[in-house]
Amino acid sequence: MAGFSKVVATIFLMMLLVFATDMMAEAKICEALSGNFKGLCLSSRDCGNVCRREGFTDGSCIGFRLQCFCTKPCA
């Protein structure tokens, strides 16, 4: 009977671990139009460099109008 209790406890702990990791929330990403990028955004690498100088974590070219949008985790 002691062996059965260990199996049940192990299964319970494994299920708890699966549900706990599933419920963890990812950080939301906020984005804003770059204030310093000039012209058409044709290179997300250039956009990202400008955004990092503005204090963001990254940036990319988005949309039909090819604008540079900066991104960072929301506070």
Swiss-Prot record:
Q: Which cysteines are joined by disulfide bonds?
A: C30-C74, C41-C61, C47-C68, C51-C70
List the subcellular locations.
Secreted
Q: Does the entry feature the keyword Signal, yes or no?
A: yes
Summary of the tissues where the protein is detected: Expressed in orange and red ripe fruit and to a lesser extent in mature, green fruit. Present in trace in young, green fruit.
Q: Which domain of life is it from?
A: Eukaryota
Q: Where is the signal peptide?
A: 1-27
Q: Single Gene Ontology BP term?
A: defense response to fungus
| UniProt entry tagged with the keyword Ribonucleoprotein | no
The UniProt similarity line reads:
Belongs to the DEFL family.
Instruction: State what protein this is by name.
Output: Defensin J1-1
Source species: Capsicum annuum (Capsicum pepper)
